[in-house]
Regions:
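A conserved ligand/cofactor-binding region detector
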Residues: 1-779
């Protein structure tokens, strides 16, 4: 498209929507107009793409996930449509900076962490490779929450993203689906047919809104269908009788389902709301999938041949019994045929190696909230136990562990494991661990179902759209084929000894650091030194991710620099970004400790030129796009055997950051790909962790005799300015569930190696090059 053509399209949209000329339009008006242009183009492309797929009988892939961490859409949509350069030129001609327009868009409040980002990347990947993919989730009105740090404490505020983000959504109230909760079930048999009557239920309407993800170079378009909860109709009779609260409460109760992502479940009301959310997503999505299939083929007999449904984690597990309900109650299939269809259609991705994190629901809550689904799960469980008895005769312990219901709980992961045709982990290590521990019995029962699908990233977003200077170097050295196939990045390996290229890599990284420092100062007022090492740990705040290990080392470095002010120490900026779950007290204490430690260090003139700590409030995808090109060290320091995979580690690697990490999750594959000599590996291996657990782990054994560990713990315990962090340190001294103290000494060794290697600028650039060159396997 020419500049002139695009300028006319933009002006026409500004005129029709706002009645203004480009020269006087506000940034918000320009953003919305560009978004509408992209949405219209992608909608038309999607219609053509789907029409062709239906005509050839192509299989449809449906991806159900509780969250999709989409970030901003304008920049990536223009980029994938091939319109970013022309849009930039049109705006520049009007003396408008396109980056300022991008900043008008809020991050979509549809996700939280790696689970949601993986889901978003899969949509991008399906669209780019021409797979007919549709994602399903909930249209959260307020997202998870907007993070505000006040005096070191995380505060949660409503993330009112829809006013700015709704422009990407097209609502389809005519395609709404009824979802039923509560009530009683009556069963009747008539001439051999089984009839179900659901009475006294509460209805909620699932109203769909669609947004689109354009594949790179226009190969395909994926759709993300988001469900908004609405009351079926206003209770006029109650209102007319003066029962205003009753009339309004029905609306409020229904719409609560799509208010926020992951409501606090530290109380019974929160648990019920989460269960309702999960069934709402599952029932609406399965109803939509069945309707789509029937409208195309007129029968469900071929559903398994034409449909694949991927369950991303256990949140959408109820899609399985809901599909059974539709096939049994509405379509007249017998049990065996219905379950055979489910087995062929559903696949399951597991995201945790910790058995305690696998979702389970109290039977009483489940039965009350979803009476018909409970009946189906009970029958599934009965049949499963019969089948398992044949496979493991007399092994009651194994059968009880594998059962779908047990200990007064409905076990989501076991429903998936029993039904799904494919059960995958998200890294090689994780996939082995689930076969050996969490799902070992199911692996013995159906070994052919278990496989590994290592996580990946939408690399064009994190490289092409985020790091143009590095892309320019890649274009000049290896050509542009990598833009279409990431495996071509490996061609960069032949420049590992090219001093000119290595010098350019260091220059590009420094320039990206300057850009990030300027962005940070402008947006937050925080000042950092671009010549310092940028050491980054940005991920969900959780004990198993061990941000407190990082903080403990920072405290140790602070004490060292106070005692040795003239020490040879390359200046370092530690960058954190993370949200803690609202009800997770220890994670919030960790945030407070990091923020207060940062305040102390950043305001101490004796050390602040050598050591700084930055906490990125409200860390999100768009902020990540600024940070990734500037990062030099990627902290991936979870206890070996606890992190399933990770995707942030891959984005850092792609942009040339060196992984400082344990051999956990996808770190193993990163080290294998780039070479362990090009990463900073520390800590126990998974078998060592397991052995230590078996013999009994006592953190005191690792603290005793370690003067540095003792000094750092004592320092944090005593605190400063009337604040202390004894709850964190007491946890580390006594229980330390994620073995921070066991790995602390080796972590310090890795940090010392980092300082030594970074001093050799050519060697560091070579390590950086090796990471970028070998990151293509994660695309």
């Amino acid at each position: 498209m020419t500049t002139k053509e695009f300028a006319k399209i933009l002006q026409d949209k500004l005129t029709s929507e706002y009645g203004v000329d480009l020269s006087v339009a506000s940034k918000q008006q320009i953003y919305r107009s560009l978004a509408l242009i992209c949405r219209q183009m992608m909608s038309e492309n999607h219609k053509k793409f789907q029409s062709k797929a239906i005509g050839t009988g192509t299989k449809q892939v449906y991806y159900l996930c509780m969250e999709f961490l989409m970030g901003r859409s304008l920049k990536v949509s223009l980029f994938n449509l091939g319109l970013e350069d022309v849009a930039q030129k049109v705006l520049a001609d009007a003396d408008i900076n396109i980056e300022g327009i991008f900043e008008e868009e809020p991050d979509a409040g549809l996700g939280n962490g790696g689970l949601g980002r993986l889901a978003a990347c899969y949509l991008d990947g399906m669209a780019t490779t021409g797979i007919c993919g549709t994602g399903y989730s909930i249209l959260y009105e307020y997202g998870i929450f907007k993070q505000k740090i006040v005096d070191g404490w995380q505060q949660e505020r409503a993330d009112n993203w829809l006013p700015g983000g709704q422009v990407w959504l097209k609502s389809h109230p005519d395609q709404a689906i009824e979802v039923r909760f509560d009530g009683e079930i009556r069963e009747n048999w008539d001439h051999g047919f089984h009839y179900i009557q659901h009475t006294n239920y509460n209805s909620v309407m699932a109203v769909p809104s669609d947004m689109y993800v354009q594949g790179y170079d226009g190969k395909g378009v994926a759709k993300l269908r988001l469900w908004q909860a609405k009351a079926p109709d206003f209770d006029m009779s109650s209102f007319s009788l003066g029962n205003y609260n009753t009339a309004m409460s029905k609306n409020a109760s229904a719409e609560l389902i799509s208010k926020v992502l992951y409501p606090n479940d530290n109380h019974i009301e929160g648990k019920i709301l989460r269960l309702r959310q999960q069934y709402f997503l599952s029932a609406a999505s399965i109803g939509d999938i069945v309707q789509n299939h029937l409208s195309t083929y007129g029968t469900l007999e071929n559903l398994a041949d034409k449909v694949a449904i991927q369950l991303n984690d256990t949140h959408p597990t109820l899609a399985i019994p809901e599909m059974m309900r539709i096939l049994l109650d509405e379509c007249g299939f017998d049990w065996d045929k219905a379950f055979e269809i489910c087995q062929k259609v559903f696949a399951y991705t597991n995201h945790t190696v910790m058995a305690e994190a696998l979702e389970k629901w109290n039977v009483d809550i489940f039965k009350m909230t979803l009476p018909r689904i409970y009946q189906i799960v009970v029958e599934m469980n009965r049949r499963a136990r019969e089948e398992l008895e044949k496979a493991f005769p007399g092994d009651e312990g194994k059968i009880n562990y594998m059962a779908l219901i047990g200990d007064n709980q409905v076990r989501m992961a076991n429903i998936c494991a029993y039904t799904a045709n494919s059960i995958n982990g998200v890294s090689k290590l994780h996939s082995e661990i689930i076969k050996e521990s969490v799902f070992h019995d199911y692996y013995l029962f159906k070994p052919q179902a278990f496989k590994n699908v290592t996580n990946g990233i939408a690399y064009r977003r994190w490289l092409l759209a985020s790091n143009p200077e590095l892309c320019k170097l890649l274009d000049e050295t290896i050509g542009e084929e990598y833009k279409h196939d990431a495996s071509n990045l490996s061609k960069l390996n032949k420049y590992a000894d090219d001093k000119t290229v290595l010098k350019r890599i260091n220059e590009i990284k420094l320039n990206n650091k300057k850009n990030f420092a300027a962005y940070l100062e402008k947006s937050t007022g925080q000042v950092i030194d671009p010549n310092s090492i940028f050491d980054c740990q940005v991920k969900r705040m959780h004990e198993y991710k061990r941000q407190h290990l990082n903080a403990l080392n920072i405290a140790a470095q602070y004490l060292y620099l106070k005692e040795n002010p003239n020490a040879d120490f390359i200046p370092k900026t530690y960058i954190f970004g993370a949200k803690a779950a609202p009800g997770y007290y220890m994670a919030k204490q960790m945030i407070r400790m990091i923020c207060k430690l940062g305040d102390l260090i950043n305001n101490d003139p004796a050390v602040r030129d050598k050591l700084r700590v930055v906490y990125l409030e409200e860390y999100c995808v768009s902020l990540s796009e600024h940070l990734m090109p500037a990062a030099e060290v990627s902290e991936q320091i979870s206890l070996a055997g606890t992190e399933a995979s990770g995707t942030g580690n891959m984005k850092f690697m792609l942009n040339g950051a060196i992984t400082l990490g344990t051999l956990d999750g996808a770190n193993v594959e990163i080290a294998d790909a780039a070479g362990k000599e090009n990463e900073l590996i520390f800590g126990m291996l998974t078998p060592e962790v397991n052995n230590l657990k078996q013999v009994g782990y006592h953190p005191s054994a690792f603290i005793m005799g370690d003067d540095v560990a003792n000094a750092a713990l004592n320092f944090l315990e005593r605190g400063w300015n009337g604040e202390d962090f004894h709850e964190v340190t007491e946890n580390l001294r006594t229980s330390d569930p994620y073995m921070v103290m066991a790995d602390f000494k080796d972590y310090r060794r890795a940090q010392a190696d980092l300082q030594r290697l970074y001093a050799d600028r050519e060697k560091w650039a070579q390590m950086s090059l090796k990471n970028t060159a070998n990151s293509g396997i994660f695309s």
